[in-house]
From Swiss-Prot:
PANTHER family: ACHAETE-SCUTE TRANSCRIPTION FACTOR-RELATED, TRANSCRIPTION FACTOR BHLH160. InterPro entries: bHLH_dom (IPR011598), HLH_DNA-bd_sf (IPR036638), MASH1/Ascl1a-like (IPR015660). This is Transcription factor bHLH160. One of its GO terms (cellular component) is nucleus. Belongs to the bHLH protein family. It is found in: Nucleus. The lineage of its organism: Eukaryota, Viridiplantae, Streptophyta, Embryophyta, Tracheophyta. SUPFAM superfamilies: HLH, helix-loop-helix DNA-binding domain. It comes from Arabidopsis thaliana (Mouse-ear cress). The gene is BHLH160. Gene3D superfamilies: Helix-loop-helix DNA-binding domain.
Length: 234
C-alpha cells in the first residue's frame, strides 16, 4: 500500500516532465507577475496620455485667442473707416494709403479744432441774433429780391408790427441811409388783430455792387441793423 502513492507521484512527475506542465505554484506566481507588469505599463502610459491632452488643449486655446484677436482688429479697422467717412474730403480721394488708420487719426485731429472754431462762431452769431430779436421784437420778416441782372434795382419787403403812425417815414429814412433811391412804395395789412403791416419798396442802388460779393445779404443785414438802431433810440 505504501508503494502505491510513490508510484502515483512518479507518474505525475513523469507527466510533468513530458508535457512541460509547470507546477501550480509556478503558474500562480507567473500570473501575478504578468498582472503586476500590465499595471506598471498602464501607469507608465498614463502620463504620456496626459501630456498629449495638455498639448491639444494648449493649441485650442491659442487658436481661440488668435480668432478673438483677428475679430478685434477687424472691428477696430471698421471703426477707423467709419470715422474717416465723417471727414469732409473723404469722398474726394480713393487712395488706400490716405485713408489708413494713422492718416485718418491725423486728419481727425486737424479737423476737430476747425469744427470747434465754426461752432464757436455760429454760437456768437446766434447770440447776436437773439439779442437783436429781444431788442426789436416788432420786426417779423424782411426780404430783398434783386430785379434783373444789372444789380442796380431790388425790391425790399419789410413786415413788422405797426407801433406808431410815422413807421412808414422811418422806413424811408432807413432806405436813404443805405444809399438807396426809392422808386415806388406800397403797404398792405397782413394781420389786423396783431397790426402787422408789410411795406414794399422798389429801390435803386446808387452804386453797382462789387462782383462776387453777396450784396443782397449785406444789404438785408444793414437794413435790419438800421431798423434795430431806430427801435433802440425810441
Amino acid at each position: 500500500m505504501s508503494s502505491q502513492p510513490n508510484h502515483q507521484t512518479s507518474i505525475s512527475s513523469l507527466l510533468h516532465d513530458r508535457l512541460h506542465i509547470p507546477p501550480a505554484e509556478t503558474i500562480v506566481e507567473k500570473e501575478s507577475a504578468e498582472k503586476d507588469t500590465c499595471q506598471s505599463q498602464r501607469k507608465r502610459k498614463e502620463p504620456v496620455l496626459h501630456e498629449v491632452d495638455g498639448s491639444s488643449s494648449g493649441a485650442a486655446k491659442k487658436q481661440d485667442h488668435n480668432a478673438k484677436e483677428r475679430l478685434r482688429r477687424m472691428r477696430l479697422h471698421a471703426s477707423y473707416l467709419t470715422l474717416g467717412t465723417l471727414l469732409p474730403d473723404h469722398s474726394s480721394s480713393s487712395s488706400k494709403k490716405k485713408w489708413s488708420a494713422p492718416s485718418i487719426i491725423d486728419n481727425v485731429i486737424t479737423y476737430i479744432p476747425k469744427l470747434q472754431n465754426e461752432v464757436g462762431e455760429l454760437t456768437l452769431r446766434k447770440q447776436k441774433l437773439v439779442e437783436l430779436e429781444r431788442r426789436g421784437p416788432s420786426i417779423r420778416a424782411i426780404s430783398v429780391l434783386e430785379l434783373g441782372e444789372s444789380g442796380y434795382e431790388a425790391v425790399v419787403q419789410i413786415c413788422l408790427k405797426k407801433e406808431n403812425e410815422d413807421e412808414f417815414s422811418n422806413l424811408l429814412h432807413v432806405m436813404e441811409v443805405q444809399g438807396l433811391s426809392v422808386l415806388s412804395a406800397s403797404t398792405s395789412q397782413v394781420c389786423r388783430e396783431q397790426r402787422v403791416v408789410c411795406y414794399n419798396f422798389h429801390v435803386k442802388m446808387d452804386e453797382k455792387p462789387c462782383e462776387g460779393d453777396d450784396y443782397i445779404t449785406v444789404l438785408k443785414n444793414n437794413i435790419i441793423s438800421s431798423l434795430r438802431d431806430n427801435t433802440k433810440c425810441k
